[in-house]
Protein backbone atom coordinates (compact mmCIF):
# COMPACT_ATOMS: atom_id res chain seq x y z
CA UNK A 1 0.00 0.00 0.00
CA UNK A 2 1.42 3.38 -1.02
CA UNK A 3 1.34 5.98 1.80
CA UNK A 4 1.73 9.64 0.82
CA UNK A 5 2.37 12.76 2.90
CA UNK A 6 0.96 15.99 1.50
CA UNK A 7 2.26 19.34 2.76
CA UNK A 8 0.57 22.73 2.40
CA UNK A 9 3.33 25.13 3.49
CA UNK A 10 2.56 28.39 5.21
CA UNK A 11 4.30 30.98 7.35
CA UNK A 12 1.65 30.78 10.13
CA UNK A 13 0.26 27.25 9.70
CA UNK A 14 1.69 24.36 7.70
CA UNK A 15 -0.93 21.76 6.91
CA UNK A 16 -0.14 18.07 6.58
CA UNK A 17 -2.20 15.16 5.36
CA UNK A 18 -1.37 11.47 5.13
CA UNK A 19 -3.35 9.15 2.86
CA UNK A 20 -2.75 5.70 1.48
CA UNK A 21 -4.08 3.78 -1.49
CA UNK A 22 -6.27 0.91 -0.38
CA UNK A 23 -9.24 -0.90 -1.87
CA UNK A 24 -9.02 1.04 -5.12
CA UNK A 25 -9.33 4.47 -3.49
CA UNK A 26 -7.52 6.90 -1.20
CA UNK A 27 -7.83 6.12 2.51
CA UNK A 28 -7.37 8.65 5.32
CA UNK A 29 -4.51 8.09 7.76
CA UNK A 30 -3.98 11.45 9.51
CA UNK A 31 -4.03 15.21 9.08
CA UNK A 32 -3.40 18.36 11.04
CA UNK A 33 -1.59 21.65 11.19
CA UNK A 34 1.81 22.60 12.44
CA UNK A 35 1.33 25.91 14.24
CA UNK A 36 4.33 28.01 13.28
CA UNK A 37 5.66 29.91 16.28
CA UNK A 38 8.68 32.08 16.90
CA UNK A 39 9.54 35.74 16.77
CA UNK A 40 12.26 35.62 14.14
CA UNK A 41 12.18 34.18 10.66
CA UNK A 42 14.83 31.63 11.65
CA UNK A 43 12.72 30.45 14.61
CA UNK A 44 9.60 30.09 12.43
CA UNK A 45 11.48 28.15 9.73
CA UNK A 46 12.99 25.89 12.40
CA UNK A 47 9.48 25.25 13.74
CA UNK A 48 8.31 24.14 10.27
CA UNK A 49 11.40 21.96 9.81
CA UNK A 50 10.98 20.22 13.17
CA UNK A 51 7.23 19.81 12.71
CA UNK A 52 7.54 18.22 9.27
CA UNK A 53 10.38 16.00 10.52
CA UNK A 54 8.16 14.81 13.38
CA UNK A 55 5.23 14.08 11.02
CA UNK A 56 7.50 12.06 8.69
CA UNK A 57 8.88 10.08 11.66
CA UNK A 58 5.41 9.45 13.08
CA UNK A 59 3.65 8.28 9.89
CA UNK A 60 6.54 6.87 7.80
CA UNK A 61 5.19 7.82 4.36
CA UNK A 62 6.58 6.20 1.21
CA UNK A 63 6.36 9.39 -0.86
CA UNK A 64 5.63 13.06 -0.34
CA UNK A 65 4.06 15.92 -2.28
CA UNK A 66 3.98 19.67 -1.75
CA UNK A 67 2.22 22.60 -3.33
CA UNK A 68 4.24 24.76 -5.70
CA UNK A 69 4.67 28.45 -4.96
CA UNK A 70 2.35 30.69 -6.90
CA UNK A 71 3.24 34.30 -7.58
CA UNK A 72 1.16 36.29 -5.14
CA UNK A 73 0.41 39.97 -5.50
CA UNK A 74 2.72 40.57 -2.56
CA UNK A 75 6.31 39.58 -3.36
CA UNK A 76 7.21 39.45 0.35
CA UNK A 77 4.45 36.87 0.97
CA UNK A 78 5.64 34.76 -1.96
CA UNK A 79 9.20 34.88 -0.62
CA UNK A 80 8.12 33.77 2.87
CA UNK A 81 6.04 30.97 1.38
CA UNK A 82 9.04 29.87 -0.68
CA UNK A 83 11.20 29.76 2.44
CA UNK A 84 8.59 27.71 4.32
CA UNK A 85 8.38 25.35 1.35
CA UNK A 86 12.15 25.02 1.22
CA UNK A 87 12.56 23.91 4.82
CA UNK A 88 9.61 21.49 4.49
CA UNK A 89 11.20 19.94 1.39
CA UNK A 90 14.55 19.72 3.20
CA UNK A 91 12.94 17.99 6.21
CA UNK A 92 11.36 15.37 3.93
CA UNK A 93 14.44 14.92 1.74
CA UNK A 94 16.70 14.41 4.76
CA UNK A 95 14.52 11.44 5.70
CA UNK A 96 14.91 9.92 2.25
CA UNK A 97 11.61 10.97 0.70
CA UNK A 98 11.22 11.95 -2.93
CA UNK A 99 9.07 15.09 -3.03
CA UNK A 100 6.68 15.71 -5.92
CA UNK A 101 5.39 19.22 -6.61
CA UNK A 102 1.93 20.19 -7.85
CA UNK A 103 0.36 23.53 -8.67
CA UNK A 104 -2.70 24.57 -6.68
CA UNK A 105 -4.69 24.49 -9.92
CA UNK A 106 -3.70 20.86 -10.63
CA UNK A 107 -4.53 19.80 -7.07
CA UNK A 108 -7.98 21.41 -7.22
CA UNK A 109 -8.62 19.94 -10.67
CA UNK A 110 -7.69 16.49 -9.36
CA UNK A 111 -9.94 16.50 -6.30
CA UNK A 112 -12.78 18.91 -7.13
CA UNK A 113 -12.86 18.74 -10.92
CA UNK A 114 -12.10 22.41 -11.52
CA UNK A 115 -8.84 24.26 -11.10
CA UNK A 116 -10.37 27.40 -9.64
CA UNK A 117 -12.23 25.68 -6.79
CA UNK A 118 -12.74 27.52 -3.51
CA UNK A 119 -11.22 26.37 -0.20
CA UNK A 120 -14.62 25.24 1.12
CA UNK A 121 -15.06 23.02 -1.94
CA UNK A 122 -11.71 21.34 -1.31
CA UNK A 123 -12.69 20.81 2.34
CA UNK A 124 -16.05 19.33 1.31
CA UNK A 125 -14.46 16.96 -1.22
CA UNK A 126 -11.83 15.76 1.24
CA UNK A 127 -14.55 15.05 3.80
CA UNK A 128 -16.60 13.12 1.22
CA UNK A 129 -13.74 11.36 -0.57
CA UNK A 130 -11.99 10.22 2.62
CA UNK A 131 -15.18 9.44 4.61
CA UNK A 132 -14.33 11.95 7.36
CA UNK A 133 -16.82 12.70 10.15
CA UNK A 134 -16.25 16.46 9.86
CA UNK A 135 -14.70 18.92 7.44
CA UNK A 136 -10.94 19.12 7.97
CA UNK A 137 -9.38 22.49 8.83
CA UNK A 138 -8.57 24.42 5.62
CA UNK A 139 -4.77 23.95 5.68
CA UNK A 140 -5.11 20.25 6.55
CA UNK A 141 -7.71 19.82 3.77
CA UNK A 142 -5.32 21.39 1.27
CA UNK A 143 -2.54 19.04 2.41
CA UNK A 144 -4.86 16.03 2.10
CA UNK A 145 -5.83 17.20 -1.39
CA UNK A 146 -2.14 17.44 -2.36
CA UNK A 147 -1.58 13.87 -1.15
CA UNK A 148 -4.71 12.61 -2.98
CA UNK A 149 -3.60 14.42 -6.16
CA UNK A 150 -0.26 12.61 -5.92
CA UNK A 151 -1.98 9.25 -5.42
CA UNK A 152 -4.20 9.89 -8.45
CA UNK A 153 -1.15 10.85 -10.52
CA UNK A 154 0.76 7.74 -9.43
CA UNK A 155 -2.22 5.47 -10.13
CA UNK A 156 -2.60 6.99 -13.61
CA UNK A 157 1.09 6.47 -14.33
CA UNK A 158 0.86 2.86 -13.18
CA UNK A 159 -2.14 2.23 -15.45
CA UNK A 160 -0.33 3.81 -18.40
CA UNK A 161 2.73 1.67 -17.65
CA UNK A 162 0.70 -1.53 -17.48
CA UNK A 163 -1.10 -0.70 -20.73
CA UNK A 164 2.22 0.01 -22.44
CA UNK A 165 3.68 -3.24 -21.10
CA UNK A 166 0.71 -5.30 -22.24
CA UNK A 167 0.84 -3.73 -25.68
CA UNK A 168 4.56 -4.46 -25.95
CA UNK A 169 3.85 -8.06 -24.98
CA UNK A 170 1.28 -8.46 -27.76
CA UNK A 171 3.55 -6.89 -30.36
CA UNK A 172 6.26 -9.53 -29.94
Curated annotation (Swiss-Prot):
DNA repair in keyword set: yes
Catalytic activity: Endonucleolytic cleavage at a junction such as a reciprocal single-stranded crossover between two homologous DNA duplexes (Holliday junction)
Needed cofactors: Mg(2+)
Residues annotated as binding Mg(2+) 1: 8, 139
Cellular compartments annotated: Cytoplasm
Binding note for cofactor: Binds 2 Mg(2+) ion per subunit.
GO cellular component, one term: Holliday junction resolvase complex
InterPro entries xref list: RNaseH-like_sf, RNaseH_sf, X-over_junc_endoDNase_Mg_BS, X-over_junc_endoDNase_RuvC
NCBIfam families: ruvC (TIGR00228)
Protein role: The RuvA-RuvB-RuvC complex processes Holliday junction (HJ) DNA during genetic recombination and DNA repair. Endonuclease that resolves HJ intermediates. Cleaves cruciform DNA by making single-stranded nicks across the HJ at symmetrical positions within the homologous arms, yielding a 5'-phosphate and a 3'-hydroxyl group; requires a central core of homology in the junction. The consensus cleavage sequence is 5'-(A/T)TT(C/G)-3'. Cleavage occurs on the 3'-side of the TT dinucleotide at the point of strand exchange.
Assembly information from the UniProt record: Homodimer which binds Holliday junction (HJ) DNA. The HJ becomes 2-fold symmetrical on binding to RuvC with unstacked arms; it has a different conformation from HJ DNA in complex with RuvA. In the full resolvosome a probable DNA-RuvA(4)-RuvB(12)-RuvC(2) complex forms which resolves the HJ.
Family named by the database record: Belongs to the RuvC family.
Protein name per UniProt: Crossover junction endodeoxyribonuclease RuvC
Species assigned in the record: Hahella chejuensis (strain KCTC 2396)
Gene assigned in the entry: ruvC
Amino acid sequence: MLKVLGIDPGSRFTGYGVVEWGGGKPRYVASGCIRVTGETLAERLRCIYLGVTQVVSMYAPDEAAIEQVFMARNADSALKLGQARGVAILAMAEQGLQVAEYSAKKVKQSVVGKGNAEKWQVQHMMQAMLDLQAKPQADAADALAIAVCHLHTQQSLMRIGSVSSSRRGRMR
